[in-house]
From Swiss-Prot, chains A, B, C:
<dbReference type="GO" id="GO:0005524">
    <property type="term" value="F:ATP binding"/>
</dbReference>
<dbReference type="GO" id="GO:0009228">
    <property type="term" value="P:thiamine biosynthetic process"/>
</dbReference>
<dbReference type="InterPro" id="IPR000417">
    <property type="entry name" value="Hyethyz_kinase"/>
</dbReference>
<dbReference type="GO" id="GO:0009229">
    <property type="term" value="P:thiamine diphosphate biosynthetic process"/>
</dbReference>
<feature type="binding site">
    <location>
        <position position="192"/>
    </location>
    <ligand>
        <name>substrate</name>
    </ligand>
</feature>
<feature type="binding site">
    <location>
        <position position="165"/>
    </location>
    <ligand>
        <name>ATP</name>
    </ligand>
</feature>
<keyword id="KW-0067">ATP-binding</keyword>
<comment type="pathway">
    <text>Cofactor biosynthesis; thiamine diphosphate biosynthesis; 4-methyl-5-(2-phosphoethyl)-thiazole from 5-(2-hydroxyethyl)-4-methylthiazole: step 1/1.</text>
</comment>
<comment type="function">
    <text>Catalyzes the phosphorylation of the hydroxyl group of 4-methyl-5-beta-hydroxyethylthiazole (THZ).</text>
</comment>
<keyword id="KW-0460">Magnesium</keyword>
<protein>
    <recommendedName>
        <fullName>Hydroxyethylthiazole kinase</fullName>
        <ecNumber>2.7.1.50</ecNumber>
    </recommendedName>
</protein>
<keyword id="KW-0479">Metal-binding</keyword>
<keyword id="KW-0547">Nucleotide-binding</keyword>
<dbReference type="GO" id="GO:0000287">
    <property type="term" value="F:magnesium ion binding"/>
</dbReference>
<dbReference type="Pfam" id="PF02110">
    <property type="entry name" value="HK"/>
</dbReference>
<feature type="binding site">
    <location>
        <position position="43"/>
    </location>
    <ligand>
        <name>substrate</name>
    </ligand>
</feature>
<comment type="similarity">
    <text>Belongs to the Thz kinase family.</text>
</comment>
Length: 264, 264, 264
């Protein structure tokens, strides 16, 4: 647990700038969560703007939740520069499987860029892994098959870390496979939990190995969610409490509460 | 009251996917309110994306709060597919009357698509009904004439349900006319109450007759607003309490608290 | 203090419509803060829409936080009409200095339009004033040189009011120089504080002299922030408390708590 807790510290110390090109639904939550986690968010999507911004950023997060042609242009320009600069790229393929446009765009980024992390729910990752999956809008879907196997083989194929969010988050870099059991159901009752997790995976990947970074990110948000749920009266009051809990999360609390399993 | 309360249950049971093409100001509130109400939101606006998404959606909500040409393209593609699939289309003509662009766009959708619901404030609906109306930005305006008559005749003309939000919400499908007295002034002190109501009208229209659905939606949000106002110290604390109150609203509470009048 | 407190009253009395073309990250916060402050927000960016909207607006706020070509088109159309109508234009050059695109766009608006207010952090204003500045994404940066001098000379050069936000906000109209010490560090731990301040500067500039208006805006938000920080457990709970505190801020509280220095 110590090594994961240290990643929390590293983010807070180095305050990495996380460049995010994301959907217009949860973008404010992503910005605030990035700050609460100890990093700095910057949102920029114009092809004219992203190259300069990537030069000073430490990670790039691409979230396709409200995709369009203009946004793809900006994402490509940013990803090209991120590749050149060698900073980690996180892809959140929101809604892959629900529409062909989203699936194909996600695949395009997977095939054309050296992604550090692909993070989605079971339906999205299942779709991209080519296994039978059901996706309904942007809700978490289901897959046939073992998520550990799917994460492992997709990670191996693309040389990146794959995160499948769920009751147990599964994380694999193609070698190791880990599970994170932290979290509470109310986290699924607010819009943006997945998007915020991707932002935070970006912050962690900016300061550490992607696999360890994603484990840390998922466990930290899960623990904060558990903490926030203690006082929340519903999804409305959960959200501010969640931001507070992420901000005040200590190493000690992380080490005590993290439920991380190494499966392989 | 029983039949309206049952619509609440139906939404929670069937969890309809509500496709929303909406403004970038209140989109996060709309997503969260849709979830709190028991439905699922999905936001998608690219012409390349919307057709696939509509195929799995149960309602389409078009909100013109921050309109532009690209968004209109996406709205038209989505509305065409919604028409083909026979799912209800809700139009929230935000700011109609304030600018010609908004008025004409709203009219275009009214004339070209079989809308299930048109929901706006007095100024917006008055403008679209061709009565003398004052609209100031996106604030609720005033109309000359009886809102019951205006809602009734506009609904009749377009074969849809018309909702005029206000201290008393007026709802008509061209045959019946109903009023909903639930709600509190602080609901007008946060941005997005009207947009959230439209999202929830979409959720209800997905599982029931539009007229009954809109009555249910307006009464449910009004009751939740009354509940939330009891503990709120201002608009800031009202908002999370409002989301909590919608989430925890029971049938019993709805039946006890709904103030619905059938005028015709 | 009396004259500043009266500006608070004037905003609440006249309820000016503040037209905002802004970034998609903090737009909801800007809308809500505008309402809490006693004004009315309207967001509209399409060239086809902005001209009609400006005709009924009392101020225009341009925030370049998530700039793109389409948005610049809308900003230019709106600024041209605002110039014609003689309403104050506030520019928030978010991220100027971080990318050339942002710097040049900010300069373009400074050179082509009669701005009433330029409001940014030290790095942004330093960049635009041509002094050595460091900017990191959209975070507040540093400048070499005296912020009072920089604000004063930039204000003089452009015939407008310049606000440099910081631990002490510096405000100058090229003649007077004032400082506002209100505020708390947690205001920098939520996304959007600067954007909300620009919106509120627009509301105040709509009803008063820009210099006095900006002093009032910065002091009022600072005092409300101090109040909200008393009960906040972190950035998450700070935000709703901040909105509540702005809404309930009284003249008496303003006069008692404002820490405004006139340096020249």
């Amino acid at each position: 647990m110590q090594k994961y807790a240290q990643i929390l510290d590293l983010v807070r110390e180095r305050n990495p700038l996380v460049h995010q090109i994301t959907n217009y639904v949860t973008v404010n939550d992503c910005a605030n969560m990035t700050i609460c986690f100890g990093a700095s968010p910057v949102m920029s999507h114009a092809p004219e703007d992203v190259v300069d911004m990537i030069k000073i950023a430490s990670a790039l997060v691409l979230n396709i939740g409200t995709l369009d042609e203009k946004q793809i242009e900006g994402m490509i320009a940013a990803a090209n520069e991120a590749k050149k600069c060698g900073i980690p790229i996180v892809l959140d393929p929101v809604g892959a499987g629900a529409t062909l446009y989203r699936t194909q765009t996600a695949e395009r980024f997977m095939n054309e860029f050296p992604l550090a992390v692909i993070k989605g729910n079971a339906g999205e990752i299942g779709t991209l892994a080519g296994v039978s999956a059901t996706v309904r809008g942007v809700d978490s879907g289901n897959i046939s098959g073992d998520p550990k196997e799917i994460a492992h083989s997709l990670a191996k194929e693309y040389g990146c870390t794959v995160v499948i969010s769920g009751a147990e988050d599964i994380i694999s870099d193609g070698k190791r496979i880990a599970g994170v059991l932290n979290g509470v159901p109310i986290m699924g009752k607010i819009s943006g939990t997945g998007c915020m997790a991707s932002a935070v995976c970006g912050a962690c990947a900016a300061v550490s190995d992607s696999m360890d970074g994603c484990i840390t990110a998922m466990a930290a948000l899960g623990i904060a969610g558990e903490e926030a749920a203690k006082t929340a009266k519903g999804p409305g009051s959960f959200k501010p409490a969640f931001f507070d809990a992420v901000t005040s999360l200590t190493n000690e609390q992380f080490i005590k509460s993290a439920r991380i399993s190494e499966y392989q």
